[in-house]
Amino acid sequence: MPYLTPDGDGWQYVMQEKDIVYGLGEMPRGLNKRGWHYETNNTDESEHGENRLSYYAAHNFLLISPADGSGCIGIFIDFPGKVSYDIGYTRHDTLRFATAEPNYALYLITAPAAAEVAKEFRQLIGPSYIPPKWAFGLAQSRFGYKTEADIREVAAQYKANDLPLDMICMDIDYMQSYADFTVDKARFPDLASLPPT
């Protein structure tokens, strides 16, 4: 594969001295990912900081912008599990990545400019979901709304104080024993009725 060479259980790319590497979605350490190592593994970390290897979301797309202006390179690893990246951390001139298992699809996109690489990537994965208008509005969110009555009281207080409110975000308290895709019917007997009337 041009640009990439096999390296044990992964691949490597030799970077120029001033190449910039973008991508990986919700990751620490600024826009240029060079000089650190990362994992994309969808972990729910309670403490976010510069030294974390992984955050909540995994976006296995890198965009390399070569310093010499020779054109940009996009690398997309289509894999649902853990991917490890060493982006100039061990060796400043080497980007290396490896998946936890061998069943993945690897895509390499080249174009003269970053915008063209991004366009090709979007064509590959499909258009982004566009949220409803209310999702861009004002939200009240916290952990600890224990019942439907709590939610209704928050909405009533916003209304009584003439404050704008487009949504109330609940954490895991509505779940039955904190199990995904469940609702505790004792505390939230009519969850569907909670949207404002």
Give, region by region, the residue ranges found by the protein language model.
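Catalytic and substrate-binding clefts that recognize carbohydrates or anionic sugar/phosphate headgroups
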Residues: 1-133, 142-143, 148, 155-160
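Aromatic-lined carbohydrate-binding/catalytic grooves of carbohydrate-active enzymes
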Residues: 129-197
